[in-house]
């Protein structure tokens, strides 16, 4: 973590935005899909409290700034900057506290500046109900900010074969095949399974070739019972974020 100041001659007892309090420097975006369409996206919000910062004159504003975020608050109204994150990856953020010029500021901007790193991951929840032709789930796990790709994809998939309510002809087993398809249209991982009537079967795996697009596919023979499909995919990064201060 880098600590410093821009402009002015500050005394040694002046606090920098290194005194900014933040309880967390990592969070997760959650995206929910139903029957092939996004129905909800929850973006995490992290808070940065400049209450412990001090300067030779009154603060004017507090700012948290990065490639995809830029939030400023009036220092006379609050010391807390709430930042919403919409991109997964490593965000390098500047914590800026601007204060009034004093007679010894030499005409420069008066501010304290600190830099931290925040890790934002992503979870995708996918559900299809009563389908006899499951759709491929496209997974674009390429990092959206920063220079480092995700460290791993964690996949958990469950196929449920609902029991027939009106048991006229009886339910049947369903033979399924899970495949993780890479950008060459080859299956880099796969798993066959059998789902009995009224039961479920799951495939859990991890994948480390993360900086490309994949399809997660579930296929089964035509004429079998309709099925429900649930996927959960976590796009995870190595824990390289700045340590929280609160």
Residue ranges of predicted features:
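C-terminal edge strands of extracellular/lumenal beta-sandwich accessory domains
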Residues: 101, 170-184, 207-246
């Amino acid at each position: 973590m880098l600590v410093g100041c821009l402009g002015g001659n500050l005394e040694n007892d002046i606090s920098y935005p290194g005194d900014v309090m933040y309880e967390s420097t990592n969070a997760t975006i959650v995206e929910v899909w139903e029957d092939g369409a996004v129905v909800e996206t929850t973006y995490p919000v992290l808070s940065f409290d400049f209450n412990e910062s001090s300067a030779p004159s009154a603060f004017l504003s507090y700012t948290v700034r990065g490639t995809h975020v830029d939030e400023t608050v009036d220092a006379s109204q609050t010391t807390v900057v709430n930042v919403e994150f919409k991109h997964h990856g490593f965000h390098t953020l500047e914590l800026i506290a601007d204060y009034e010029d004093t007679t010894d500021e030499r005409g420069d901007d008066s501010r304290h500046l600190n830099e931290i790193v925040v890790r934002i991951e992503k979870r995708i929840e996918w559900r299809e109900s009563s389908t006899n032709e499951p759709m491929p789930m496209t997974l674009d796990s390429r990092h959206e900010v920063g220079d480092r790709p995700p460290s791993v994809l964690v996949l958990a998939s469950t196929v449920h074969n609902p029991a027939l309510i009106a048991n006229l002809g009886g339910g049947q087993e369903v033979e399924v095949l899970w495949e993780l398809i890479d950008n060459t249209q080859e299956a880099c991982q796969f798993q066959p399974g059998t789902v009995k009537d009224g039961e479920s079967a799951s495939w859990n795996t991890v994948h480390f070739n993360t900086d490309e697009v994949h399809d997660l596919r579930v296929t089964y023979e035509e004429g079998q019972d309709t099925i429900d499909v649930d996927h959960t995919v976590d796009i995870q990064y190595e824990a390289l974020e700045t340590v929280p201060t609160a």
